Design a protein with these regions (language model features):
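Alpha-helical membrane-protein topology signature
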Residues: 2-209
Length: 209
């Protein structure tokens, strides 16, 4: 047969599709930023860019293959948005939450160096990443108009598919896609809760200037 669609091949394809959807979600987010509808938090996205590199490398070193595309995009995407946040974003290292994020990022690198273990590095990186998401969750609740729902919805789909692309059901491989999916669902839920009229916008996705 020309194509051998066994379970492993399907997982490879799902991982690739998840990466493509994640990439498209970031494109939506970038467009929203350039149109002035979304104002990314500088602290969050710079830390995410840095942690995206750390997580991607440690996740790959932990044995991930099929699911590596999303972590790769989770470095490229946040780096692009972090650069845009210099001009179009808001916030910075001007409050306790942001300072905790910075301290956590530094601590993660130190732990990686001390233990020289990719799994420990991965877990510590995800803990730091969870600190970095706090400013965005807070902003999503206080000012939901400052976040793009459909971009987050797209990343939620990507991370859901990535769950099915997992090649080995072991902690080192499962922890990243589970963490990412939970993070996406929290922000999606907050945005749905705060954006009362979000369902009315479905028919007008391309209508905004």
């Amino acid at each position: 047969m020309l194509f051998n669609f066994d379970l492993e091949n399907i997982k490879v394809v799902l991982g690739l599709i998840a990466g493509i959807i994640a990439f498209l979600a970031y494109i939506i987010y970038v467009i929203s930023i350039l149109r002035g509808k979304t104002k990314p938090n500088r602290a969050t996205w710079w830390i995410w860019a840095f942690m995206g590199l750390v997580v991607g490398l440690s996740y790959y070193a932990s044995g991930a293959q099929n699911t590596i595309w999303v972590p790769f995009i989770e470095f490229i995407g946040p780096l692009s948005i972090a650069l845009l946040s210099i001009k179009y974003g808001e916030g910075g290292l001007d409050n306790k939450t942001d300072l905790i994020c910075l301290f956590g990022a530094i601590l993660s690198v130190i732990l990686w160096i001390i233990f020289d273990n990719p799994v420990i590095a991965l877990v510590s990186s995800l803990v730091v990443d969870s600190f970095a998401i706090v400013p965005t969750i807070k902003k999503s609740y206080l000012r939901p108009e400052g976040e793009d729902f459909w971009a987050w919805f797209g990343t939620g789909i990507a991370d859901s598919l990535n769950m099915f692309a997992v090649e080995k059901f072991i902690f080192a491989i499962l922890v990243y896609p589970i963490y990412m999916l939970v993070s996406d669902l929290i922000i999606i839920f907050v945005l749905l809760l705060r954006k009362k009229g979000i369902m009315k916008d479905i028919s007008f996705l391309g209508k905004h200037d």
